[in-house]
Amino acid sequence: MIAKIEQLLKEVEALHASNAEELEALRIKYLSKKGAINDLMADFRNVAAEQKKEVGMRLNELKTKAQDKINALKEQFESQDNSCDGLDLTRSAYPIELGTRHPITIVKNEVIDIFARLGFSIAEGPEIEDDWHVFSALNFAEDHPARDMQDTFFIEAHPDVVLRTHTSSVQTRVMETSKPPIRIICPGRVYRNEAISYRAHCFFHQVEALYVDKNVSFTDLKQVLLLFAKEMFGTDTKIRLRPSYFPFTEPSAEMDISCNICGGKGCPFCKHTGWVEILGCGMVDPNVLESNGIDSKVYSGYALGMGIERITNLKYQVKDLRMFSENDTRFLKEFEAAY
């Protein structure tokens, strides 16, 4: 009898059921009126008197453990069933919403890729800058309008600290710490103290380029600009350079491209001129080179800079700059096929 009880105890401890039907079969096998434990209870009357106490205790232990094991398995199945309450397995799955790249990111990466193929590497710098790297090192006079609080965000407690107004500050940091040849592009966000409207914003994105080496000429700059325009806007794109002024370049120019909407024939977008301005450029002023520790008698260079929002406007005919920062998913989904 003791041997049979020990054998059943081992079986009970190892009980396992994969579903409710298997559990019910185990209950019937061990705990029903015709079950194995009840059969042992019926044989208990035949146990010798001196063994009845020990056998009775072991039988009660077996029955208790079997009942506890069956109950534990039952609770396990019930908890699994409750976890699915309210779950309609026949309902169609929700569609998976895929994210898309922001149009500014798409165009910025395209600009970077074009210049990377020309051998330019990416350089980055802080958005919170000091006056030296934003203005003084770039040949801005003390009374230059860009230093005015109406154009630039200054930190009130520290007037020498500003939010950078252009990524040219990255160029000055690279020139301070690197020796020519220098061939970099500087993508990033910049800030201007301007009223927000359909054509202006208090922050926007720029990509600037700098090349400093021996015997760099304006011809080199023009060739890079032409290649960039054709890669960005199509092989039929034409460019023209108009004289301009920037404190950090001399000579300086504004670059226009033939309107990619009307093909240069004239339309409302280009104000019927056939041309659209996209960037500023020029040869690096010798004073800027000297301010950053580069001998202007040995080295020369060119710089150019463009607003990414402006380029994006031209590529996708977006008429309101504010749309780029409003996170309207209806607008952003229109660019799913743009990359």
UniProtKB/Swiss-Prot annotation:
An annotated Gene Ontology molecular function: magnesium ion binding
InterPro entries per UniProt: aa-tRNA-synth_II, aa-tRNA-synth_II/BPL/LPL, Phe-tRNA-synth_IIc_asu, Phe-tRNA_ligase_II_N, Phe_tRNA_ligase_alpha1_bac, Phenylalanyl-tRNA_Synthase, tRNA-bd_arm
A single BP term in Gene Ontology: phenylalanyl-tRNA aminoacylation
Cofactor: binding details: Binds 2 magnesium ions per tetramer.
Entry binding sites for Mg(2+): E250
GO CC entries: cytoplasm
CDD domains: PheRS_alpha_core (cd00496)
Main localization (coarse): cytoplasm
Catalytic activity: tRNA(Phe) + L-phenylalanine + ATP = L-phenylalanyl-tRNA(Phe) + AMP + diphosphate + H(+)
Known cofactor(s): Mg(2+)
Alphabetically ordered keywords of this record: Aminoacyl-tRNA synthetase, ATP-binding, Cytoplasm, Ligase, Magnesium, Metal-binding, Nucleotide-binding, Protein biosynthesis
Pfam families per record: Phe_tRNA-synt_N, tRNA-synt_2d
Broad enzyme group: ligase
EC number in record: 6.1.1.20
Subcellular location: Cytoplasm
NCBIfam families found in the cross-reference section: pheS
Record family assignment: Belongs to the class-II aminoacyl-tRNA synthetase family. Phe-tRNA synthetase alpha subunit type 1 subfamily.
Subunit field text: Tetramer of two alpha and two beta subunits.
Classification via HAMAP family: Phe_tRNA_synth_alpha1 (MF_00281)
Protein name from the UniProt record: Phenylalanine--tRNA ligase alpha subunit
